[in-house]
């Protein structure tokens, strides 16, 4: 896919899925703006991504803070020229059984995952509406569709993202802004690599394809939804879960 000249904003892009998405876009010719909560990690990611030869900027922000989101989008427009694609990837977990989960654990996850998606979208939409063109891809999760014990806060946030995606698609279609979501299943990361073999084997028993997704699998799904190949797709939740939930 060719994204030459396109400007893409990706939240939570210093590592894991977010970094893989950013890497895929720069390799496809896009200019990229990334953000994270650790300034050193943001700077390191910017340096790595810049090797592809496109423009890359990075900022340390809190996606749950409206002014941070507004400033980040303003900086992106100033330095890159516009915003064509927004990928809402930033997310955290604070797992606990419901009866033990604190309000702080609940609020922290909802604020970053759900409120952050809302605030960043709202900031980017001002740019997209003005040019009557844009594309938003939200990262949800398979657990937002099927639930998961010990993750009431995370599941609620990811289910909320699915509902928000469908609502956004209905609201913004007349402005030529498409909104879709990707719902990953188990994804291979440094964290999953460190799990005991018996734990990984038990997890894979539930996956018909018998492997974890690679971060690049998620990146490819995001790029498809952001591309012209998906120009008549909006309000869709693309499952990338190896058949874990059908």
Label each PLM-derived region with a short phrase.
Residues 126, 170-174, 231:
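Alpha-helical segment proximal to the catalytic Tyr-Lys
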Residues 39, 60-72, 103, 216-217:
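The beta1-alpha1 cofactor-binding region of Rossmann-like NAD(H)/NADP(H)-dependent oxidoreductases
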Residues 97-98, 102-110, 192, 203:
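Substrate-binding pocket helix/loop in short-chain dehydrogenase/reductase
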Residues 181, 204-229, 233, 240-242:
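C-terminal helical subdomain
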Residues 7, 14-16, 38:
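Conserved glycine-rich cofactor-binding loop
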Residues 141:
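Residue(s) in the substrate-gating loop at a strand-loop-helix junction
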Residues 121, 157, 165:
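Active-site helix of classical SDR
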């Amino acid at each position: 896919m060719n994204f030459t000249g396109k400007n893409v904003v990706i939240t939570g892009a210093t590592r894991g899925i977010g970094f893989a998405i950013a890497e895929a876009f720069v390799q496809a010719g896009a200019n990229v703006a990334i953000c994270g909560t650790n300034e050193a990690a943001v700077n390191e990611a910017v340096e790595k991504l810049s090797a592809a030869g496109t423009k890359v900027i990075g900022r340390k922000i809190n996606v749950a803070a409206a002014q941070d989101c507004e400033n980040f989008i303003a900086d992106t427009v100033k330095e890159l020229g516009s915003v064509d694609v927004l990928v809402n990837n930033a997310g955290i977990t604070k797992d606990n059984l419901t009866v033990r989960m604190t309000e702080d654990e609940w609020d922290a996850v909802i604020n970053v995952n759900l409120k952050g998606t809302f605030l960043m979208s709202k900031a980017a939409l001002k740019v997209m509406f003005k040019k009557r063109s844009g594309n938003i891809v939200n990262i949800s999760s398979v657990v937002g569709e099927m639930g998961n014990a010990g993750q009431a806060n995370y599941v609620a946030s990811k289910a909320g993202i699915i509902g928000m995606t469908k609502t956004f698609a209905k609201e913004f279609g007349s402005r030529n802004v498409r909104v879709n979501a990707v719902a990953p299943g188990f994804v291979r990361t440094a964290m999953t690599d460190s799990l005991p073999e018996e734990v990984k084997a038990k997890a894979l028993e539930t996956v018909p394809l018998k492997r974890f997704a690679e971060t690049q699998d998620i990146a490819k799904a995001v790029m498809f939804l952001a591309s012209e190949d998906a120009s008549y797709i909006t309000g869709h939740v693309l499952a990338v879960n190896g058949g874990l939930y059908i």
